[in-house]
Amino acid sequence: MINWVVTGIGVITSILLLVIIWYFYNDHCIVLKRYALPYGTVEIVDSSCQEGLPHTWSPSIIRMTESDWISSRRDSILRHERVHLRQRLEPEAWRSFYRSEWGYELTKQPPPGIPPHWLERLRPNPDTADGPWAVWKGRYAFFPTYRDAKRSLRSTNVQVWDVLKKQIVDIPGSWKQHFCDGGNCPHQFEHPHEIAAEYITNNFNSPAAQQLAESLLVKQ
């Protein structure tokens, strides 16, 4: 009987995740303009597309609003999103670096045991879609969730699931020592794709940032 219950929960969880992913990644965005750049194309979209947040859509497409395109932040945004383009182009090279240097393993499926109410609040991200679940040191799964019932992409929290204790825990101190620059930690620390993009864009000086700066991923 217990095995049937466990199997049923697993099936329900898988269906729930598929529905969330289908809805989020089904392209509802209207492209208003296109600009060709040496490394890809920028598509200008309206503010309803991913709530106006810049993101990548393919290995060669960056999307942003007109207001971001003409703002003083444009170069910084493009630098950040260009890192995501490279992550899409060379996924195995980045995964290998995350695994060997940062201790991360990326997976398509969530670690076993995460309660459905957390999975229902999962906040998907186009820039991490190749492996949205990031498990650090084989124990801590980082993932972003909507903060409230409004499910706004701009209002999220990052949860840390302890695979061994089977519960949500605080950010491990050892993680902070490696990934934070003193008291300055990456803003989007839910996934190494976002951590790497922040490091390259904002010139962090944490041990993890130094590892990235010395890697072939940055020097090539």
Predicted features along the sequence, with ranges:
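Hydrophobic alpha-helical membrane-insertion segments, chiefly the h-region
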Residues: 15-22
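N-terminal Sec-pathway targeting helices
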Residues: 1-14
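Acidic helix-start/capping segments at beta-turn-to-alpha-helix junctions
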Residues: 45-51, 94-107
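Short, flexible loop/turn elements at secondary-structure junctions
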Residues: 48, 66-68, 83, 87
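Catalytic Zn2+-binding segment of zinc metalloproteases
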Residues: 82-98
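Short pre-active-site segment immediately N-terminal to the catalytic Zn-binding motif
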Residues: 63-78
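Metalloprotease/metallohydrolase-associated module, dominated by Zn2+-dependent proteases
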Residues: 99-215, 220
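Auxiliary, metal-adjacent structural segments of Zn-dependent hydrolase domains
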Residues: 25-63
